Curated annotation (Swiss-Prot):
GO terms of biological process kind: mismatch repair
SUPFAM superfamilies: DNA repair protein MutS, domain I, DNA repair protein MutS, domain II, DNA repair protein MutS, domain III, P-loop containing nucleoside triphosphate hydrolases
Top-level division of the source organism's lineage: Bacteria
Binding-site positions, ATP: G618, P619, N620, M621, G622, G623, K624, S625
Gene Ontology molecular function terms on file: ATP binding; ATP-dependent DNA damage sensor activity; damaged DNA binding; mismatched DNA binding
Name of this protein: DNA mismatch repair protein MutS
Organism: Shewanella baltica (strain OS195)
Family from the record: Belongs to the DNA mismatch repair MutS family.
Keywords per UniProt: ATP-binding, DNA damage, DNA repair, DNA-binding, Nucleotide-binding
Main function: This protein is involved in the repair of mismatches in DNA. It is possible that it carries out the mismatch recognition step. This protein has a weak ATPase activity.
Top-level taxonomy: Bacteria, Pseudomonadati, Pseudomonadota, Gammaproteobacteria, Alteromonadales
Any one Gene Ontology cellular component term annotated for this protein: cytosol
Gene3D superfamilies: 1.10.1420.10, 6.10.140.430, DNA repair protein MutS, domain I, MutS, connector domain, P-loop containing nucleotide triphosphate hydrolases
Length: 856
């Protein structure tokens, strides 16, 4: 029941009227409606929750004459159910009872106090600790797109102006948001396939003027020039929608969102969506994290360091100055072995970044404050460790870490050593922090002694040996006497409860004491909650400095991690060159060498101005794809400041890395494997430059032999002669090995293999020159193809080779066929192709005929 007609509300009970009114305000999400110890869901929400969560679907009487579908879940287990829902992209509005049932004449007053969506999570239990949790918004203009992302759990706010559909696709792949807001007229919904939390928003939420006002109010500035984003119109519209959505869902101030940055593609190496996917940077082809570059490089000490590392991997730097600053820091950490001590110190800091976000939102829990206290207490020791380091970048980070002795001392005085999870039942504020709280607690905590004394006194006074004094939460304090001795109780005993073998009583004295104790408990809890809220006010003035500390600690963690990885995995520091080129000695694939059961064979690569393209041949299973990927990964690692798996690496400037490796049908978009392959190829041919690194694997294999060969030849020729990109071009078309004879800068290399009888041994070693054969039948035999089929294939191969040998004398050489001169354009045909006959008058058509006759 998503749309509520208010005229029909009178048909329902008062409680259901209340529910339906609230549901109408939150029609696009599940409504958890608190009733006692349960959250109830009704109508379509109940059916959906039953399906998604596996909870029972029942009915609750009738309202408006029809049975009401209902499903419920206990309030104390809600976090587990919320975790399941947000993982599948579902949003939830949580409606709590805020009125007192005892004093309510109608339905208990209720209010939606919390909205949980996949992209606005801050609760530790609902977040993946080593992954960013990004909310994104996208807006489509007449030309280009505006894109904005916000991590509410850290406050990181980034926008990007994107010119093309391909660049938006790459950004979606890079940022991998868990929730995406898009406008009603967004025209590229196909790009959002595969993302779970999609939210269509009204066009007015993307209004430019409204967006600017929202952002200025949030940042407390007069304009946006200081952020360098004033001209980013489309992305500011996306950012405004995003900001409004967060305000609507969080319903509180957002002081930790205090800056916004612009992602400029020119600052980092551009990686399109296909490249990120094919290189398996942070996600493997199956969607997991195993056997990815991040899995190998990530031995960080903190969750916030792990998240930063993944951002670095997806955003390799182009500025050599920034790369060298990271390299110098890593080198010093490695040479001094300082990384070993830093790892342990940083590990004890925990996830300060997300703790600070919860603090800013005032949703931090007692244990968050305890962790913050612990982290602040470690800073003097951390500062001491950093004081011995002199690398400029490390020194700069140390300045941001600072020390917070006043805040650490405050938390030491205020919070008990091992606080409970929630403030709800108290027990969080340390004794001695507040004298009034100690006084109220003293009254309540002295109750045990009082009850012991009262019991002894009453036993002596009455002579009843079964008399006991006790307490329970339902009936309060009581004096208990056995049924047999109940006739002996004094006249001032008032019966409170009758049990099977016992009677329970209350006396005026005990009643008075009960009221005093319960009053003191209530006052103590109320005061403790008040003191708890004041702690936020006392810590928040240091929010920005604490956020800077968290960012600096995360970066130190990544740099320290790079040093440890270099030492453990045998990596070397790559050299940066001003000249275009990639030269690697004994390079290794960082992932394959870690998972391989056999020693990895290291291989070189040399690309420079006079050697721009390598035609890579060799058998299937010979290692061509691994070799190509390792070149790209080593290049990328060098540009994030990481050491690389090679004996030596000299890397020149790179603007883009392209890969066309492997493909499968894109069923969602209705594209065949060959269409996917050609789309990726077209993107490379349109966008690659002389500073790009291009990996092309098996172009043309998805169509007929001559079609495929022609496409592969032409693509290689275009890259070598028109683009001049540094290219590794793997192929099984041996005709392409003739390219070096026809074009300067093109060379053959091959992956070696040794054949013995009917078996083959892959050497995985790269050698100069072309491969002699493809070994396809031997590989098929290794794969388990039946021997009968292999024998038939050998016979057929001999027939084909014999026929080809006989025809050699009459065939035109391949270089003559494929290296034909460019076709000369016919001016008459060119003119004709540009004509729109619907726009010609009879006179213009006649004049055009004469002109075409002249041109022909």
């Amino acid at each position: 029941m998503n749309v509520i007609d208010t005229d029909d509300l009178e048909k329902h009970t008062p409680m259901m009227r209340q529910y339906l009114t609230m549901k109408a305000e939150h029609h696009d999400m599940l409504l958890f409606y608190r009733m006692g110890d349960f959250y109830e869901l009704f109508y379509d929400d109940a059916k959906r929750a039953s399906e998604l969560l596996g909870i029972s679907l029942t009915a609750r009487g009738k309202s408006g004459g029809d049975p009401i579908p209902m499903a419920g879940l206990p309030y104390h287990a809600v976090e587990g159910y919320l975790a399941k829902l947000v993982q599948i992209g579902q949003s939830v509005a949580i409606c709590e009872q805020i009125g007192d049932p005892a004093t309510s004449k109608g339905p208990v007053e209720r209010k939606v106090v919390r909205i949980v969506t996949p992209g606005t999570l801050t609760d530790e239990a609902l977040l993946q600790e080593r992954q960013d949790n990004l909310l994104a918004a996208v807006y489509q203009g007449k030309i280009g797109f505006g894109y904005a992302t916000l991590d509410v759990s850290s406050g990181r706010f980034v926008i990007a102006e994107l010119d093309t559909r391909e660049s938006l696709e790459a950004e979606l792949q890079r940022t991998n948001p868990v929730e995406i807001l898009y406008s009603e007229d967004f025209g590229e919904l196909g790009l959002l396939n595969g993302f779970k939390g999609k939210r269509r928003r009204p066009e007015w939420e993307f209004d430019y003027d409204t967006s600017i006002k929202l952002l200025l109010t949030q940042f407390g500035t007069k304009d946006l020039h200081g952020f360098g984003i004033a001209d980013a119109r489309l992305s500011l519209q996306a950012a405004g929608c995003l900001m409004q959505y967060v305000k609507d869902t969080q319903r509180t101030a957002l002081p930790h969102i205090n800056a916004i940055t612009r992602f400029n593609q020119t600052d980092s190496i551009v990686l399109d969506a296909a490249t990120r996917r094919n290189l398996e940077l942070t996600q493997n082809l199956a969607g997991g994290r195993d056997n990815t570059l991040a899995a190998v490089l990530d031995n960080t000490a903190t969750p916030m360091g792990s998240r930063m590392l993944q951002r670095w991997i997806h955003q390799p730097l182009r500025d050599p100055k920034h790369i060298k600053a990271r390299q110098q820091a890593v080198t010093e950490l490695l040479d001094t072995t300082a990384h070993e001590g830093l790892h342990e110190q940083l590990k004890a800091l925990g996830d300060i970044e997300r703790i600070m976000a919860r603090l800013a939102l005032r949703t931090a829990r007692p244990r968050d404050f305890a962790r913050l206290r612990q982290a602040l207490g470690l800073l003097p020791e951390l500062q001491q460790s950093l004081s011995t380091l002199s690398a400029p970048h490390t020194t700069q980070l140390r300045q941001h870490i600072g020390e917070f002795p006043a805040e650490q001392a405050l938390l030491e005085r205020a919070i008990v050593d091992n606080p409970p999870m929630l403030i709800r039942d108290g027990g969080v504020i340390r004794e001695g922090y507040n004298s009034e709280l100690d006084e109220w607690r003293g009254l309540s905590e002295g109750a045990s002694d009082y009850l012991v004394q009262l019991e002894a006194r009453e036993k002596e006074r009455t002579g009843i040996n079964t008399l006991k004094v006790g307490y329970n939460r339902v009936h309060g304090y009581y004096i208990e006497v056995s049924r047999l001795q109940s006739s002996q109780v004094p006249l001032n005993y008032q019966r409170r409860q009758t049990l099977k073998n016992m009677e329970r009583y209350i006396t005026p004295e005990l009643k008075e004491y009960e009221e005093k104790v319960l009053s003191s408990q209530g006052k103590a809890l109320a005061l403790e909650k008040q003191l708890w809220e004041q702690l936020f006010d006392l810590i928040l003035p240091k929010l920005h400095e604490l956020q800077a500390f968290a960012r600096a600690a995360a970066e130190l963690d990544v740099l320290s991690n790079f040093a440890e990885r270099a030492e453990t995995l045998g990596y070397t520091c790559p050299e940066l060159s001003q000249d275009i080129g990639v030269q690697i000695e004994a390079g290794r694939h960082p992932v394959v060498e870690r998972v391989s059961q056999t020693p990895f064979i290291a291989n070189p690569v040399t690309l420079h101005n006079q050697r721009r393209m390598l035609i890579v041949t060799g058998p299937n299973m010979g290692g061509k794809s691994t070799y190509m990927r390792q070149v790209a990964l080593i290049t990328l690692m060098a540009h994030i400041g990481c050491f690389v798996p090679a004996d030596r690496a000299l890397i020149g400037p790179i603007d883009r890395i392209f890969t066309r490796i492997g493909a499968s049908d894109d069923l969602a978009s209705g594209r065949s494997t060959f269409m996917v392959e050609m789309t990726e190829t077209a993107n490379i041919l349109h966008n690659a430059s002389a500073s790009s690194l291009v990996l092309m694997d098996e172009i043309g294999r998805g169509t007929s032999t001559y079609d495929g060969l022609s496409l592969a030849w032409s693509a290689a020729e275009y890259l070598a002669q028109q683009v001049g990109a540094m290219t590794l071009f793997a192929t099984h078309y041996f005709e392409l090995t003739q390219l070096p004879e026809l074009m300067a800068g093109v060379y053959n290399v091959h992956l070696d293999a040794i054949e013995h009888d009917d078996t083959i041994a892959f050497m995985h070693a790269v050698q100069e020159g072309a491969a002699s054969k493809s070994y396809g039948l031997q590989v098929a035999a290794l794969a388990g193809v039946p021997n009968k089929v292999i024998k038939a294939a050998k016979h057929k191969l001999q027939q084909l080779e014999s026929r080809d040998h006989q025809a050699e004398g009459t065939r035109t050489p391949i270089q003559s066929l494929l290296a034909l001169p460019e076709p000369v354009e016919n001016p008459a045909l060119t003119k004709l192709s540009n004509i729109n006959p619907d726009n010609l008058t009879p006179k213009q058509a006649l004049d055009l005929l004469y002109e075409l006759k002249r041109l022909s």
